[in-house]
């Protein structure tokens, strides 16, 4: 995520769109999880609920065998959270056995073992591998059935993507098409699945994303392969019709389209299809 994210943020600052990178609003952060005993959404969401996040809408992705929820932050200066989960029991017996070979080492809910009010412990948890490094063969075998499964078996619970809130940028760059043009001028490749701009049914949520950076991954026995890492998303949330006559200075987060859209998210997942 570092190349695309840091590069685009620095260029946003250098173009004078914002005075510093801290002014770039983070629309949401997304994580991927495995839906197995002691893990998955039920475990991972505790971190955010403990800090005042509210569980919101449910989403299901039939073809990808995924479920997801989004979580509203306790204050508008914090990002939304989007947590998805692979329904492992919907996969083939072969894929399930590969996944369980690694996740069965997690004997209890790991979140229960950390102090959720200790930011250092939470940060360390998010960066600590929950199971051993997979073999390249296991990774490839999972990839042949579920890209999501392969991504998680290697990356574990590492941040999947971060999202720049385009509508909060000044001037012409608050338009997603114009912002995409800027992003492409930096040499960042966009995910074209479903079109460069994914549009919700109500036309009020528009999203784009970069194609995930490829990283050289080291597997068991020292084998290496280029695989998908993380990526950056760009979201434009339109003002709700009932607030369209408000002055621009009055517009707050609550006046804009909330939540997510299954059709959009389904294509955003494919940012790691590299």
Where are these regions (language model features)?
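Active-site loops and adjacent core secondary-structure elements that bind or stabilize anionic groups
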Residues: 10-11
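Amphipathic alpha-helical segments
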Residues: 38-57, 171-186
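Internal, hydrophobic cores of structured domains that mediate oligomerization or house catalytic pockets
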Residues: 45, 50-160
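Single conserved hydrophobic/aromatic residue that forms the stacking wall/gate
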Residues: 1-7
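Terminal, regulation- and interaction-focused segments at domain boundaries
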Residues: 18-41, 156-177
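A contiguous, surface-oriented mixed alpha/beta subdomain in the mid-to-C-terminal portion of proteins
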Residues: 112-231
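Long, compositionally biased intrinsically disordered terminal regions
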Residues: 207-274
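An acidic- and aromatic-residue-enriched active-site/binding cleft used to recognize and process polar
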Residues: 34-36, 58-63, 86-88, 169, ...
């Amino acid at each position: 995520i570092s190349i695309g994210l840091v590069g685009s943020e620095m260029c946003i600052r250098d173009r004078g769109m914002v005075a510093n990178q801290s002014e770039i609003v983070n629309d949401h952060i997304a994580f991927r999880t495995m839906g197995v005993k002691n893990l998955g959404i039920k475990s991972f969401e505790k971190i955010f609920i403990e800090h005042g996040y509210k569980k919101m809408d449910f989403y299901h992705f039939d073809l990808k065998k995924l479920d997801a929820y989004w979580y509203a932050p306790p204050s508008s200066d914090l990002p939304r959270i989007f947590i998805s989960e692979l329904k492992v029991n919907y996969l083939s017996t072969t894929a399930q056995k590969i996944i369980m070979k690694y996740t069965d080492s997690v004997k209890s809910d790991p979140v229960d073992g950390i102090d959720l009010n200790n930011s250092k412990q939470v940060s360390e948890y998010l960066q600590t591998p929950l199971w051993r490094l997979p073999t390249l063969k296991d990774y490839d075998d999972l990839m042949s059935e579920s890209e999501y499964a392969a991504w998680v078996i290697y990356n574990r619970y590492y941040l999947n993507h971060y999202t720049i809130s385009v509508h909060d940028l000044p001037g012409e760059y608050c338009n997603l098409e114009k912002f995409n043009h800027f992003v492409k001028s930096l040499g960042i490749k966009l995910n074209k699945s479903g079109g460069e701009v994914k549009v919700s049914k109500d036309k009020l949520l528009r999203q784009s994303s970069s194609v995930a950076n490829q990283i050289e991954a080291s597997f068991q026995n020292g084998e290496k392969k280029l695989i998908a890492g993380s990526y950056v998303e760009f979201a434009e949330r339109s003002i709700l019709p009932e607030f369209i006559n408000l002055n621009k200075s009055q517009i707050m987060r609550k006046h804009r389209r909330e939540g997510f859209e299954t059709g959009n998210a389904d294509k955003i997942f494919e940012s790691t299809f590299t």
